Regions:
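Short, P/G- and charge-enriched loop/turn segments at secondary-structure junctions
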Residues: 2-6, 59-61, 87-89, 101
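Generic structural detector for well-ordered beta-strands
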Residues: 17-21, 48, 62-64, 74, ...
Length: 153
């Protein structure tokens, strides 16, 4: 007899950090362009605005991935040259997804970029949730590495 895994809600976090040898302004220009994701996020086909507002709290974007999946995100916090926070409202197997991308100048030409998120799943098995967290961690790592390569050119 095969025991089925009980499905329930799960909560977790993902946090990834990378150091980039460039100016804080250059990093901020790249990450604060909220529809510029195809230039550094892996597997993103296109990103468009869903709001008239293009920057800051209230800006909304729709991300289309190469597999056709779409995610709608709303900017809910913004501090120029320091961080922005966004929530996903559609497109993920989650009840809640809140993420912040922040930058901190370590020295004149060294910037630390941190991408962290809080995740609360829809009903799924613990194994499925752990696989999802691992996927998100890999996605953040690969995307931050792309950002580093682009900005250190």
């Amino acid at each position: 007899m095969i025991k089925s895994q009980k499905k329930s809600f799960h909560t977790g976090t993902v946090k990834k950090t990378i150091k980039i040898k460039t100016s804080k302004d250059k990093v901020w220009r790249k990450i604060s362009n909220i529809i510029g994701l195809p230039t550094w996020l892996i597997d993103v086909k296109k990103t468009i605005y869903l709001s008239k507002k293009k920057r800051g709290v209230g800006a909304i974007r729709l991300i289309t991935f190469t597999d056709g999946n779409e995610i709608e995100e709303h900017v809910v916090a913004w501090k120029d040259r320091e961080y922005f926070t966004y929530i996903a409202t559609e497109g993920l197997p989650l009840r809640a997804y809140v993420a912040t991308i922040s930058i901190r100048e370590k020295s004149n030409k060294l910037v630390e970029v941190t991408w962290q998120s809080y995740i609360n799943s829809k009903k799924m098995s613990e194994k499925q949730f752990m696989e999802f967290l691992a996927f998100m961690g890999s996605f953040y790592d690969a995307s931050l590495e792309n950002l580093k390569i682009i900005l250190e050119k």
